[in-house]
UniProtKB/Swiss-Prot annotation:
Cross-link Glycyl lysine isopeptide (Lys-Gly) (interchain with G-Cter in SUMO2): where in chain: K173, K221
UniProt-annotated location(s): Nucleus
Keywords: DNA-binding, Isopeptide bond, Metal-binding, Nucleus, Repeat, Transcription, Transcription regulation, Ubl conjugation, Zinc, Zinc-finger
Name of the protein: Zinc finger protein 611
Top-level taxonomic group: Eukaryota
Matches recorded under SUPFAM superfamilies: beta-beta-alpha zinc fingers, KRAB domain (Kruppel-associated box)
A single cellular component GO annotation: nucleus
Record organism: Homo sapiens (Human)
Organism lineage string: Eukaryota, Metazoa, Chordata, Craniata, Vertebrata
Length: 705
C-alpha cells in the first residue's frame, strides 16, 4: 500500500484514486542509492549495478510486450463486449532534480532496445511495433547541484521514469470499461489512444490465469519472469531474454556477414572477429608470455599457452580417461573415440573429424596461399610454413630431457624419445617386425605389397615413399634450396645439409654400444650394428649375394643391370651411385674438405681420411680368417680373400683377361684405349696411371723415395 500511495503521489494523484491494475513498473524492482551512497561504490560495483538494472528492465519489457501482443481490437457491434488495446506513451517531464550520475548509461542501453513482432508482418497482418527510441533532452541537461542526497527513487519519479513507455492494457467489460475511460481522462500526460491489432489466434499466457488484469498474481510470478526467455530463434529453437541477443544469434542463420577484411576479402559476423583476423596481416602479437617471452595475437591463445608451463589439464574425456589442457583438444579426442567424422569434402566425399582438417584439405583446388619469403616455397597450411621457417633460422625449440638433443619439430622429439624407451608398439602381421612409429609400419607394408604410390610426372618412375619422389624431383630439376651458412654449399635435401654441417662441427653424435665407434649419421650407425650381428637379410635375386643393408643391395643390383643414372655435367661421365658422382665432382673443383688433424693432409673423401688416420694409429681392424693377415682397409681384405679363393670377378671385354680388383681392370683397359688421364702440370706429359704420374713428379722435385 505504501508503494501504491507513493506511486500515486508521483503522478499527482490522491491516495484514494483508482489506478489501472496489473501493471508492474521499473521502479518497483529498482535498487535505490543516494548520491552519497553512489560515490562509495567502486567501478566494478557500478558496472554490476548497471547490468542488473538493464536485465530487470528487459524482463519487464518482455512481459509487457508479450502481454500486449495477446490482445486484439474487435470493432464494436453494439453488444458491449469489445476488446480494445490502448497504448499511452507518457510525455517527457521537464525536471531539474534528476542527476545523470547513475542512470545515464542505463538509459542509453534501454533506448537502444527494440521490440518487434515481425511474424505478423510476414503473414500480412498489422503488427504492433513498439520501439523505445533514444531520447534527447532533459536527463543530459540536469544539474547535479539540485540532486543533493535525495533518494534516486524520488529523482527518477518525475524525469527518468517518464522516458520509459507505460503501456496500459485493459479489457473493456462492464465497470472496467468505465474505469478505463475515467483513468484516461484524469491523466493529462497520456497521449491520444492508438489502436493496434494483433493476431486473432494469439492466446493469453496461462501465467496469469484468464484475466490479464489479475494484479494479485503478478508479484508471485515475478521470479518466473526474471528467468523467462521469450525471444526464440526459429532456426535453432534457442531462446533469449533480450531481442538484441536474438538478433546477434540469428546473423549466422541469415548469412549476414557484414564485416569484411580489406586485405583478403574474408567476411565475419562480428566486428571483434574481424579485429582478431586483422592481426594475421599485420603480424601484431600484443599478448606476451611472462615465462618464455612468446607472443600471441589473441588473448585466448596466451591463456592456452600458459597451461603448458603450469601443467594444468582441466578437460577430462569420459570415454578414454585422457585429460587435456584445452577444450578444443578434448573435442578432437572425443571425435576420435566415437569415430565421428562430421566434416565432409564435397569433391571426394572424404570425411574429417575437425573443421580445420577439412579447410586444409586443398588437394582439389591446389591452393597454396602461404609463401616463404626466403626460398619462395609455397604451402597450403599456415602451420606448415611456420615450421618450415625453422629450417632457415636454425631454430630447434624442442629439446630431449634425457640427452639434451634439440629438434626442429615436435614430431621429431616424440620419435627420438622412443630411442630411450626402446618402445616399439607397431607390429607387422606379415613378418612380425616391430616399429616405434605407425608411419614406419605403413611404409614397411608397401615393401610386402610392392606398392609404389608416388609417381614422377616427368619420367613415370614410381616410388614407395613421398620423400623419395621429392628427392627424385629435385635431381631432375637441379633444385637445391638448402644452403650451408659456413661455406655456401647448397643441397637438394635438408638431411644432406644437416649431415654436411657435421663436417664443419666435427660432431658425431651416434655411438656404437659394442665397439664405441661414433658416426655422424644414424643410418651409418644402424648399418654398422649389422656388422656385429653378421645378419644379412637383403639378398640379390641374380647371384644370391646377401647384404646387410638395403642400400647395399640397391647398389649391387646396378652391377647386373649396368644402370648408371648419375651423370657429371662437366665431363658427362656416369656413375651407378650418387656418392660416386659427388666424389667425382671434387676432381673438377679440386675441393678437399676432409683434413687430417695429425699432419694437416687433406682429402676429397671422408673414407680416404679414415683410412689415412690408420697410418698414424697403426690400426688394422680387418683380419683374414684363413691366414690371420690384417689390413687397414676393408677393400684390401676383400681383394686378399680372392687370393685364397682364386676368384677374379672383373673381366676385360676386349681380351678376356680377368682381375681381382676393379681398379686393376680400369688400369688394364687404358692399354687398349690408349687413354692417359693423368697429366703433369709442370711439363704437360700424360700418363695412364696415377702411380706413373707420382713417380714422374719426383723428377721435377728432385725427391728420392
Amino acid at each position: 500500500m505504501l508503494r501504491e500511495e507513493a506511486a500515486q503521489k508521483r503522478k499527482g494523484k490522491e491516495p484514494g484514486m483508482a489506478l489501472p491494475q496489473g501493471r508492474l513498473t521499473f521502479r518497483d524492482v529498482a535498487i535505490e542509492f543516494s548520491l552519497a551512497e553512489w560515490k562509495c561504490l567502486n567501478p566494478s560495483q557500478r558496472a554490476l549495478y548497471r547490468e542488473v538494472m538493464l536485465e530487470n528492465y528487459r524482463n519487464l519489457e518482455a512481459v509487457d510486450i508479450s502481454s500486449k501482443c495477446m490482445m486484439k481490437e474487435v470493432l464494436s457491434t453494439g453488444q458491449g463486449n469489445t476488446e480494445v488495446i490502448h497504448t499511452g506513451t507518457l510525455q517527457r517531464h521537464e525536471s531539474h532534480h534528476i542527476g545523470d550520475f547513475c542512470f545515464q548509461e542505463i538509459e542509453k542501453e534501454i533506448h537502444d532496445i527494440e521490440f518487434q513482432c515481425q511474424e505478423d508482418e510476414r503473414n500480412g497482418l498489422e503488427a504492433p511495433m513498439t520501439k523505445i527510441k533514444k531520447l534527447t533532452g532533459s536527463t543530459d541537461q540536469h544539474d547535479h547541484r539540485h540532486a543533493g542526497n535525495k533518494p534516486i527513487k524520488d529523482q527518477l519519479g518525475s524525469s527518468f521514469y517518464s522516458h520509459l513507455p507505460e503501456l496500459h492494457i485493459f479489457q473493456i467489460k462492464g465497470e472496467i470499461g468505465n474505469q478505463l475511460e475515467k483513468s484516461t481522462n484524469d491523466a493529462p500526460s497520456v497521449s491520444t489512444f492508438q489502436r493496434i491489432s494483433c493476431r486473432p489466434q494469439t492466446q493469453i499466457s496461462n501465467n496469469y490465469g484468464n484475466n490479464p488484469l489479475n494484479s494479485s498474481l503478478l508479484p508471485q510470478k515475478q521470479e518466473v519472469h526474471m528467468r523467462e526467455k521469450s525471444f526464440q530463434c526459429n532456426k535453432s529453437g534457442k531462446a533469449f531474454n533480450c531481442s538484441s541477443l536474438l538478433r546477434k544469434h540469428q546473423i549466422p542463420h541469415l548469412g549476414d556477414k557484414q564485416y569484411k577484411c580489406d586485405v583478403c576479402g574474408k567476411l565475419f559476423n562480428h566486428e571483434q572477429y574481424l579485429a582478431c583476423h586483422d592481426r594475421c596481416h599485420t603480424v601484431e602479437k600484443p599478448y606476451k608470455c611472462k615465462e618464455c617471452g612468446k607472443t600471441f595475437s589473441q588473448e585466448s591463445s596466451l591463456t592456452c599457452h600458459r597451461r603448458l608451463h603450469t601443467g594444468v589439464k582441466r578437460y577430462n574425456c569420459n570415454e578414454c580417461g585422457k585429460i587435456f589442457g584445452q577444450n578444443s583438444a578434448l573435442l578432437i579426442d572425443k571425435a576420435i573415440d566415437t569415430g565421428e567424422n562430421p566434416y565432409k569434402c564435397n569433391e571426394c566425399d572424404k570425411a574429417f573429424n575437425q573443421q580445420s582438417q577439412l579447410s586444409h584439405h586443398r588437394i582439389h583446388t591446389g591452393e597454396k596461399p602461404y609463401k616463404c619469403e626466403e626460398c619462395d616455397k609455397v604451402f597450403s597450411r599456415k602451420s606448415t610454413i611456420e615450421t618450415h621457417k625453422r629450417i632457415h633460422t636454425g631454430e630447434k625449440p624442442y629439446r630431449c630431457k634425457v640427452c639434451d638433443t634439440a629438434f626442429t619439430w615436435h614430431s621429431q622429439l616424440a620419435r627420438h624419445r622412443r630411442i630411450h624407451t626402446a618402445k616399439k608398439t607397431y607390429k607387422c602381421n606379415e613378418c612380425g617386425k616391430t616399429f616405434s612409429h605407425k608411419s614406419s609400419l605403413v611404409c614397411h607394408h608397401r615393401l610386402h605389397g610392392g606398392e609404389k604410390s608416388y609417381k614422377c610426372k616427368v619420367c613415370d618412375k614410381a616410388f614407395v615413399w613421398s620423400s623419395q619422389l621429392a628427392k627424385h624431383t629435385r635431381i631432375d630439376c637441379g633444385e637445391k634450396p638448402y644452403k650451408c651458412n659456413e661455406c655456401g654449399k647448397t643441397f637438394g635435401q635438408n638431411s644432406d645439409l644437416l649431415i654436411h654441417k657435421s663436417i664443419h662441427t666435427g660432431e658425431q653424435p651416434y655411438k656404437c654400444d659394442e665397439c664405441e665407434k661414433v658416426f655422424s649419421r644414424k643410418s651409418s650407425l644402424e648399418t654398422h650394428k649389422i656388422g656385429h650381428t653378421g645378419e644379412k637379410p637383403y639378398k640379390c635375386k641374380v647371384c644370391d649375394k646377401a647384404f646387410a643393408c638395403h642400400s647395399y643391395l640397391a647398389k649391387h643390383t646396378r652391377i647386373h643391370s649396368g644402370e648408371k643414372p648419375y651423370k657429371c655435367n662437366e665431363c658427362s661421365k656416369t656413375f651407378s651411385h650418387r656418392s660416386y658422382l659427388v666424389c667425382h665432382h671434387r676432381v673438377h673443383s679440386g675441393e678437399k674438405p676432409y683434413k687430417c688433424n695429425e699432419c694437416s693432409k687433406t682429402f676429397s673423401r671422408r673414407s680416404s681420411l679414415h683410412c689415412h688416420r690408420r697410418l698414424h694409429s697403426g690400426e688394422k681392424p680387418y683380419k683374414c680368417n684363413e691366414c690371420g693377415n690384417t689390413f687397414r682397409h676393408c677393400s684390401s681384405l676383400i681383394y686378399h680373400r680372392r687370393l685364397h679363393t682364386g676368384e677374379k670377378s672383373y673381366k676385360c671385354t676386349i681380351c678376356d683377361k680377368a682381375f681381382v680388383r676393379n681398379s686393376l681392370l680400369s688400369r688394364h683397359t687404358r692399354i687398349h684405349t690408349a687413354e692417359k688421364p693423368y697429366k703433369c702440370n709442370e711439363c704437360g706429359k700424360a700418363f695412364n696411371q696415377q702411380s706413373h704420374l707420382s713417380r714422374h713428379h719426383r723428377i721435377h722435385t728432385g725427391e728420392k723415395p
